[in-house]
Every structure is written in C-alpha cells, then in structure tokens.
C-alpha cells in the first residue's frame, strides 16, 4: 500500500498579495501608487508549458512565472485576476489564477509589472 502525501511542500518562499492604491495630495492630485498587502502565501515555482501559454493567451512574451500556492478559503469570493503579487522584491501582475480540480491548490500566472519612469 502506497501512502499518498497529505500536502505538497511549498518551500520556494513567501509571496505577498494585495492591491495598488493611488495616493493623492491634499489638493487631490495623484502623486503615486503604493502596494497594500492583503496577506502572504507560501509558493512553489512551476515550469511553464506550451498549454500554459495557450490558456493564458500570451503566445510570445508576457508570461514570466507560474507559481503554485495553497487555495485559501478567503480567495473564493475575490477577483484574483486584479491582484498584485510581490515576490523577492519584484512586483508582478496576475494574468490568470487557476485552481486544481479539488480546489486545494491555486496556480498564479504572473507577468512582471512595468516600472514607470520617475
């Protein structure tokens, strides 16, 4: 009898997820954006396959990283595609978020955010 693992080890690090909020001056002018963290998740970096590029709809460039995390119950009610992810000090946009058949794991397809010139 073969024992199935209870959970997969997600030990590549922790990612921070959240939203970008616009900061405004007292006059109401936009002065920039700041990342507001909603939480942290342990992740494992996954390899990208051709089917991942087709599913996301990005054929040549744009898909930088695919990560696997546990599926928190709080994620069932939010739009995961509008999230921003901060990993190792690098900000990423979530292109697509997909779950497995058991809704135990969540896969984030990430594109590195473009830095604005300051």
Residue ranges and their predicted role:
Residues 1-33:
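Active-site-proximal polar cores
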Residues 2, 30-118:
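Short, conserved turn/kink motifs that form compact alpha/beta structural patches or helix kinks used as
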């Amino acid at each position: 009898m073969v024992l199935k693992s209870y959970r997969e080890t997600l030990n590549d690090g922790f990612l921070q997820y959240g939203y970008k909020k616009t900061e405004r001056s007292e006059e109401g002018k936009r002065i920039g954006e700041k990342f507001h963290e909603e939480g942290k998740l342990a992740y494992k970096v996954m390899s990208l396959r051709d089917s991942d590029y087709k599913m996301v709809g990005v054929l040549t460039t744009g898909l930088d990283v695919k990560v696997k995390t546990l599926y928190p119950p709080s994620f069932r009610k939010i739009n995961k595609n509008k999230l921003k992810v901060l990993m190792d000090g690098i900000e990423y946009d979530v292109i697509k978020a997909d779950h497995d058949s058991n809704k135990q794991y969540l896969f984030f397809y990430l594109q590195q955010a473009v830095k604005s010139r300051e």
